[in-house]
A protein has these predicted regions:
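N-terminal/domain-start alpha-helical segments
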Residues: 1-123
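Regulatory hinge/linker segments at domain boundaries
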Residues: 125-127
Length: 127
């Protein structure tokens, strides 16, 4: 079973994503501020991260940069920021995908599946 970490401070959105992904067969972990994400990633093998950009204490772009320095886990950004430049900046910083809020749950699921397929293909090619 693939493991997904959701880092989203909005409890309603976090719960909605968690419940939906569990119903679709994923093991889901939740964080609400990302303060301890690196410690968590060193302890638990995660297959994909869903990361909000507007978080308390540390912004998602800083968390993304920290993740990229140490891990190759796919990161799917969810954000209310709709500007093209914001999307470009985050993709260049290391995000693998970007979805604008409000989002369609089926689109989120399709993007997760797509990113996980890509990683599985890359792992098979490297073996």
């Amino acid at each position: 079973m693939d493991k997904i970490l959701i880092i989203e401070d909005d409890v309603e959105i976090n719960t909605l994503l968690t419940d939906f992904l569990k119903e679709n067969g994923y093991v889901v972990y939740s964080q609400y501020d990302g303060l301890h994400v690196l410690d968590f990633l060193h302890k638990e093998k995660i297959d994909l991260i869903i990361l909000d950009i507007m978080l308390p204490y540390r912004s998602g772009d800083i968390i993304l940069a920290d993740i990229r320095r140490q891990f190759t886990i796919p990161v799917l950004i969810i954000s209310a920021k709709e500007t093209t430049q914001n999307k470009i900046d985050l993709l260049r910083l290391g995000a693998d995908d970007y979805i604008t809020k409000p989002f369609d749950m089926e689109e989120v699921l399709a993007r997760i599946e797509s990113n996980l397929r890509r990683v599985q293909f890359e792992n098979r090619s490297a073996a």
